[in-house]
Amino acid sequence: MTSLISITLDELLINEDINDDYTCCVCECLLIEALQCRNGHVACKNCFIKIVKSKKECMTCRCEIKSIESLSKNRYLEKEIRKLNINCPNSFLKRELNLNNNNKNGNGNEGSSANEIEQPQQPQQQQPQELIKDINNGCKEILTIDQLDSHLKQCEYRFLKCTNLYANDLCSELDICGYDYRYNQSEKHRDECPYGIIGCTLCGKDCSRVDIESHTENHCPKLLVKCPTCNQDQLIARCDLDDHLSVDCAMIEIDCILKESGCKERVKRNQLANHLSSDNHLLFINNQFNQQNDIINQLKLELSHCNDLNEILTAKLDRYNNDNTMFRGKWVISNWTDKLNQYPPKKYLSLDFNLSQNKPFSIRVYPNGSSVMWHNCTISLVKLYQTESTIKFSFEIENEDPLKNDLQTKTDIFKGLNDSWSLQFFKVCDQANNNGFIINDTLTINFSIKIKKCFENIFITE
């Protein structure tokens, strides 16, 4: 694309024959920012800036000018100039309007013209200095200078710079496309940009358009290729090639299947059948048969041992299951007020039962506390058999509000005969202050007992 360094508003004018009063008497550019001395002599702002820096006097009447701030704007001239009709700068080549400069030099410094539209220059590249009308693709809009700013923001022909990045394998830096295209050609450039990301049609991987051919030919796992060894007509996906070589390829050399029986030759896969038909393989086959017989016999011995072990474990499991019985019950104690009076501390009510044939237990309730915990209702579980056991048990005292039931659970080792563990219930008091646990002068206890493990009784004689 050919590009210019700058376009001035003067060059965009539809009618170049304009009133001389509309141009600066110094630089002869349009008076986009018209300033005047106290005597009314007009020049553009940038020319007055140069004057203030050097002579500090009006170029026409020589009156003193101390600073730019001492000058006044000529709003009438500015208003009339902004009514002039111009071409859209996008009717030519890429331009950006800069209303803060005012010099035909177009160098972008303080002395540049306010009515220039600057075009970025390519470094170390000479740009042509002529206007080229883009008849086919340029904007056809005719507008006033006053309308220019708002038009440029939405012009369909404005220029954009592509920002697509490319990771070049040859260097660590990212390349940028940087191509200049018109806004209304965005979709076309997106479909053509060499750095644009597209998906591989075979495997779906995202690649830059410039790399897609290399990806397909050299890396795509779904590309159909010929086997480099057998070169068969049937094509294979690149990702399946290793499996083909290790399992199917007819031309790959493999070990004889009787290698473990003594044959050390390697043959091509498609010649294996002929190789196995040779006479000397009868000996190898017999060796393999004997080896497998030995393996079978060994496995039979191991299986028999496993069966014996399984019977032993099954018997132990049955015994464990029998000892691991869960017992649940409910003990309702009425006339609780009388019980509080009848059973002072250390005295208890008892409930005896059998968990199984040889597993008797007793539950003891101390209304006024046991010998250890005084003045609080205490419930104890007593083991009435000799064998040491790990037991999980729980006691739950019902409340008139089921959500407030008091549940306590414990797991511990009960040693010998009459060994016991106790749980204390602090919330259960006399009837006058029972916190909802004494319902109609009745205390209800839910309990569960489970023997988790029984230890063997060992007797030693010396």
Curated annotation (Swiss-Prot):
Its main location: cytoplasm. Residues 326-449 form the MATH domain. Keywords: Cytoplasm, Metal-binding, Repeat, Zinc, Zinc-finger. One of its GO terms (cellular component) is cytoplasm. Pfam families: MATH_2, zf-TRAF. PROSITE patterns: MATH, ZF_TRAF. GO terms for molecular function: zinc ion binding. A zinc finger (TRAF-type) spans 150-217, 214-273. It is found in: Cytoplasm. The MATH/TRAF domain binds to receptor cytoplasmic domains. This is TNF receptor-associated factor family protein DDB_G0267754. The lineage of its organism: Eukaryota, Amoebozoa, Evosea, Eumycetozoa, Dictyostelia.
